[in-house]
From Swiss-Prot:
The active site is at R268 (proton donor/acceptor). The record marks E112 as: Important in orienting the L-aspartate substrate. It catalyses: L-aspartate + O2 = iminosuccinate + H2O2. Its cofactor is FAD. Belongs to the FAD-dependent oxidoreductase 2 family. NadB subfamily. Catalyzes the oxidation of L-aspartate to iminoaspartate, the first step in the de novo biosynthesis of NAD(+). The gene is nadB. It is found in: Cytoplasm. Pfam families: FAD_binding_2. GO terms for cellular component: cytoplasm. This is L-aspartate oxidase.
């Protein structure tokens, strides 16, 4: 089945939804998602969104991001992130986003690891869910935007290093989407790992297609492990994250001997490594995160999602310490893009976790992921707004069979598993089996 559209967006997380909303209303947009629209990492994000408080805070925000990233970031990208943060937060608010506020009506800012000041806006401990719902509801109002769920994109349509759309599979039917511009916003790699906070459907499909088409990628070894996922030996599903904002509000990390062993607000990689060492020293599979000294009413109001989830597993976090351990959480590497999110293939953009803007360096600063998705997806959309009238659609017929599609899907899977096995080396057993 052949479908013509102006802009094809692969993914329905913050980067996909926000790019769609940032395109002009006379542009026909088709969005594809592998499962349900809400089954994205954005929906799971807890802590919040970083933002420069004002012009004066921008240099400090840049410095914090560079320091957390071990100075392997692209500084100009970080400057863009800081400079354009507030305007995108304001746009979210105009769409109806409800951030937590102080009694005087001002935004309530919290602090997380490696931030010098409180600069993170949030919606209790379910910021990502509220961001998703805000953007998704706005998208549903736009007659120029169509979302197709439960469809697996398995290949890009290209010729002479120019992208003309993508091929996808739904209910054993092959769909060929011809577009003037294509945005890859397909998310990260957590579904490749046995233990991850990510949705299980996020299996590096965008990275696989980029590798198969010789599209430039960067820093594929930059994989972040979040220090504090709930330790639960009874489930093989995605691991439940205990937000960094819990430590930002005063939560303490303790060994199983109830001793503090690390500054809780150091960068994530530092805290995760400290926990690994403590677990090895004590021959334990977890350490404790303790918030029992906090007021119970504050805990249930500030962290309602975490409280309810832990309680459903028999753990009252107002009275008991939380067993936590590091698990795979975020992918800082990805498809190499310029400052407008353009890849090395013409008319193909990449935004969000699948992309490498250079913002994060070797270790992402807490709560910069949703912000990156906002800032650089808007830049992609604005670039398309200015260029789309000069682009002609190429309706190249792929003539793929179901057998071809299934073979390519298997090939994509093998490519990324083999790639990340070579990257992880001795830790390759953390990946799922092919």
């Amino acid at each position: 089945m052949n479908i013509q559209t102006d802009v094809l967006i692969i993914g329905t997380g913050v980067a996909g939804l926000y790019s769609a909303l940032s395109l002009k209303n006379d542009i026909k947009v088709t969005m594809l998602t592998k499962s349900k629209a809400c089954e994205c990492n954005t929906y799971l994000a807890q802590g919040g969104i970083s933002t420069a408080l004002n012009k004066k805070d921008e240099p400090l925000f840049v410095d914090d991001t560079l320091r957390a990233g071990q100075y392997r970031n692209i500084k100009e990208s970080v400057k863009i992130l800081a400079a354009e943060s507030k305007q995108n937060i304001d746009t979210l608010i105009n769409f109806g986003m409800k951030f937590d506020k102080n009694e005087d009506g001002s935004l309530n800012y919290t602090r997380e690891g490696a931030h010098s000041v409180n600069r993170i806006v949030h919606s209790t401990d379910e910021t990502g869910k509220v961001v998703f719902e805000t953007l998704y509801n706005e998208v549903k109002k736009r007659p120029n935007i169509e979302i197709i769920e439960n469809i697996q994109v398995f290949d890009l349509i290209s010729e002479d290093n120019i992208c003309f759309g993508a091929s996808a599979l739904k209910n054993n039917t092959i769909y060929t989407f011809h577009s003037k511009a294509t945005i890859l916003a397909s998310g990260g790699i957590g579904g490749l790992f046995k233990n991850s906070t990510n949705q299980r459907t996020l299996t590096a499909d965008g990275i696989a297609m980029a590798l198969r088409h010789n599209i430039d990628v960067r820093d594929l070894n930059y994989i972040q492990f979040h220090p504090t996922a709930l330790y639960d030996s009874n489930t093989q599903e995605k691991k439940f994250l205990i937000s960094e904002s819990v430590r930002g509000e005063g939560g303490k990390l303790l060994s199983i001997e109830n001793e503090r062993f690390v500054d809780e607000l150091l960068p994530r990689d530092v805290v995760a490594n400290a926990i690994y060492k403590e677990e090895e020293k004590d021959n334990s599979k977890y350490v404790y995160l303790d918030i029992t000294s906090m007021d119970a009413d504050f805990i249930t109001k500030r962290f309602p999602g975490i409280y309810k989830e832990c309680l459903s597993r028999g753990l009252d976090i107002t009275k008991n310490k939380i067993p936590v351990t590091p698990v795979q959480h975020y992918f800082m590497g990805g498809i190499k893009v310029d400052f407008n999110s353009l890849t090395s293939m013409k008319n193909l953009y990449a935004c969000g976790e699948v992309s490498s803007t250079g913002v994060h360096g070797a270790n992402r600063l807490a709560s910069n992921s949703l912000l990156e998705g906002l800032v650089f997806s808007k830049r992609a959309a604005e670039n398309i707004n200015h260029s789309i009238s000069f682009i002609e659609r190429n309706e190249k017929n792929e003539n793929l069979t179901l057998s071809d599609a299934l073979s390519i899907i298997k090939c994509n899977r093998n490519i990324v598993i083999n790639k990340f096995e070579s990257i992880l080396g001795e830790k390759k057993n953390e990946l799922v089996n092919i």
